[in-house]
Amino acid sequence: MRNYYIFSNGRIRRKENTIYIENEQGDRKAIPIEDVDTIHIFGEVDLNTKLLNFICQQGKTVHFYNYYGFYSGSLMPRERNVSGHIVVKQVEHFLDPERRFYLAYSFVEGAIFHMVRNLREYKNTDEFQEKIKKELSNAVETTKISELMGCEGRARDFYYEAFNTFLKSDFSMGKREKRPPRNPINALISFANSMIYTTVLNEIYHTQLNPTVSYLHEPSERRYSLSLDIAEIFKPLLADAIIFKLINNNMIKLDDFEEDVNYCYLNESGRKKFIREFDQKLSTTIKHRKLKRNVSYRTIIRIECYKLIKHFIGDEVYAPFKAWW
C-alpha cells in the first residue's frame, strides 16, 4: 500500500472497488482501493458520500490541505482498534502531574537530541549545539509544562538560528514565523511539519491510542494533540533533514515558492519535490538494534506509539526514539 497525493483540481469517484481520479482536462487515473494507504488532497476536488463511505469502510484515511498547502483536517474512519482500557490509562497519565511531566519531558528530550544530531553534520555550529543542550539541562530543573515548553522553544530558536551557517544564502532563516510564514525557508518548514503531523496521526490511528490525549501540548478541541507530541521527535530527524538536502543540493529553488503580501508558500512544483523525498525517506529502512531486523522510518513512528501503550499499561518505561547511527 502507498500514499497518494492529489494536486490537480477535479473529482474523485468510486466504481466498484476502484477509485477514479479525474482532473479538469478529463484525464482519469484508476487506483485499486487495496493499493491505497492514505490520500492527501491539495487540489480543489469534488467528492461524494458514496466515495467517502467506501473509503471509511475500507479503513483508509484522507487528509485535506488548504490553498497554501497547510493541513486543514482529516477524514478518519471509525476506529477499529478501540480500547477503553488504554484510553483510561492515557487519561490517568495526563491527570497525574508527575507522570504527565515525565512524558512531556521525554518528547522534548527526543526532539533536542535530533536537533543536536543534525547540527553535528555542519561546521561552525558548536556554539549553537551547546546552547541547545543547555536548554535540555534547564528542562530537567523545571516542574511545570509551561516552563518545559519554554526550554524547548528556546532550544528550537537556537536551532533555527544555526540554519544560517550552513543553508544556501537564498534561504536565509531570519526568525521562525508560522502564521503566516513570510519567507521560503519558513514556508518549507511549515509544510514539512504538516506532513510529519499527518504521518504521525496515521500511525496513531493504527494503534489503540487516542490522538486527543496529549502531554506536552495541551489537549484541546479541533486538533489531535498527541500527534503534535510525537511529531516533536521526528521533525528534526525526518522533515529538517529533507529540507537541508533539498536546499543544499539545489533540488529546490526560489521559483518553487509563491510570495504574497506578508505570505510565502510552496507552489505545486515545490510541494511535489518535498513529497517525493519525504515518501522515499519514510520507506527507507534501517537495522533496528532491538528488533534485529530492518524497519522503515514509517514503522519506527508506529513503534513509538506502541512504546507509549506499553508505558501506559506498565509493561515498559517509555524512552523517546533516538537515532543511533
UniProtKB/Swiss-Prot annotation:
Alphabetically ordered keywords of this record: Antiviral defense, DNA-binding, Endonuclease, Hydrolase, Magnesium, Manganese, Metal-binding, Nuclease
GO biological process: defense response to virus; maintenance of CRISPR repeat elements
Family the UniProt entry places it in: Belongs to the CRISPR-associated endonuclease Cas1 family.
Binding site for Mn(2+): E152, H217, E232
Entry's EC annotation: 3.1.-.-
Pfam families: Cas_Cas1
Description of how the protein assembles with itself and partners: Homodimer, forms a heterotetramer with a Cas2 homodimer.
Coiled-coil boundaries: none
Enzyme type, top EC level: hydrolase
CDD domains: Cas1_I-B
Function: CRISPR (clustered regularly interspaced short palindromic repeat), is an adaptive immune system that provides protection against mobile genetic elements (viruses, transposable elements and conjugative plasmids). CRISPR clusters contain spacers, sequences complementary to antecedent mobile elements, and target invading nucleic acids. CRISPR clusters are transcribed and processed into CRISPR RNA (crRNA). Acts as a dsDNA endonuclease. Involved in the integration of spacer DNA into the CRISPR cassette.
Cofactor: Mg(2+); Mn(2+)
A GO term, aspect molecular function: DNA endonuclease activity
Domain of life: Bacteria
Database matches in InterPro entries: CRISPR-assoc_Cas1, CRISPR-assoc_Cas1_C, CRISPR-assoc_Cas1_HMARI/TNEAP, CRISPR-assoc_Cas1_N
Organism in which the protein naturally occurs: Thermodesulfovibrio yellowstonii (strain ATCC 51303 / DSM 11347 / YP87)
Name of the protein in its database record: CRISPR-associated endonuclease Cas1 3
